[in-house]
C-alpha cells in the first residue's frame, strides 16, 4: 500500500481542520509552509524516509547534533540514522518543542483521569494519517515527533510544564525537505491542558512552488 491521505498541489493551500490529520509525500528540495490561521494552535509532525520508512525523524539525534533543545530557523532536523531530513527555513513564532512526544489516550488518562477515555489524541491522528501506507502506531514513536508551535518550559527545579502557546494569527513555519519523505501531521486535538489555549483551531498547509 502506498497512499497518502492527501495529494497537495504546490502553491495551493490546504486547510487542516481542528483536530484533523493529514499525510502527504514531499520531494527532496521541496518546502512546506504551516500557517496558524487564528494563532495558538499546535501541530505534531512525524516523517519517514520514503524509500525506507524504518528511517524516521529523531528528536534525540536532532538535539545531539544541534547541541540544542530549542529548534527554530535555521536549525536542521535529523533522522534516527543522524542523516539530514529537514531544514527550518522560516519560523515566525520561534517556539517549537523538540523533546519528543505526542498525546495518547493512555497518557491522557494517566494525567487527566477517566474524562480522557476515548478523547481525540495525536497518536490516533498520526496512525490514521499513515494507515494508507500500511503502517500503524508501531511504525513511529515519541522520539519521531516534532511539536510545531508548542510551548514547553523546564524550570530550574526540574519541573516540566506545557504552557500557553505564543503563536499569533498568520504566524508560519517553513520546512525544507532534505530527502524524499512521507509526512504525517496531527492538528493537535487536546483540550485538557494549555497546549492550544483550550480551543481547537484550523491550520493551513501549503507545499510552496519552486523558487526557480
Predicted feature residues:
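Acidic, Ser/Thr/Pro
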Residues: 1-212
Amino acid at each position: 500500500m502506498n497512499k497518502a491521505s492527501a495529494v497537495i498541489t504546490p502553491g495551493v493551500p490546504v486547510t487542516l481542520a481542528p483536530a484533523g490529520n493529514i499525510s502527504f509525500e514531499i520531494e527532496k528540495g521541496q518546502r512546506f509552509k504551516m500557517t496558524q490561521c487564528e494563532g495558538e494552535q499546535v501541530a505534531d509532525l512525524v516523517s519517514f524516509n520514503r524509500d525506507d520508512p524504518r528511517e524516521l525523524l529523531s528528536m534525540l539525534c536532532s538535539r545531539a547534533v544541534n547541541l540544542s533543545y530549542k529548534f527554530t530557523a535555521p536549525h536542521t532536523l535529523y533522522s534516527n540514522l543522524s542523516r539530514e531530513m529537514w531544514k527550518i527555513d522560516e519560523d515566525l513564532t520561534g517556539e517549537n518543542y523538540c523533546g519528543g512526544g505526542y498525546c495518547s489516550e493512555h497518557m491522557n488518562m494517566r494525567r487527566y483521569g477517566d474524562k480522557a477515555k476515548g478523547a481525540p489524541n495525536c497518536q490516533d491522528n498520526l496512525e490514521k494519517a499513515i494507515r494508507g501506507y500500511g503502517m500503524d502506531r508501531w511504525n513511529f514513536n515519541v522520539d519521531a515527533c516534532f511539536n510545531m508551535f508548542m510551548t514547553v518550559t523546564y524550570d530550574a527545579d526540574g519541573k516540566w510544564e506545557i504552557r500557553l502557546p505564543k503563536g499569533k494569527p498568520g504566524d508560519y513555519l517553513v520546512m525544507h525537505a532534505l530527502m524524499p519523505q512521507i509526512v504525517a501531521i496531527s492538528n493537535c486535538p487536546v483540550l485538557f491542558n494549555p497546549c492550544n489555549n483550550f480551543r481547537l483551531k484550523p491550520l493551513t498547509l501549503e507545499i510552496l512552488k519552486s523558487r526557480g
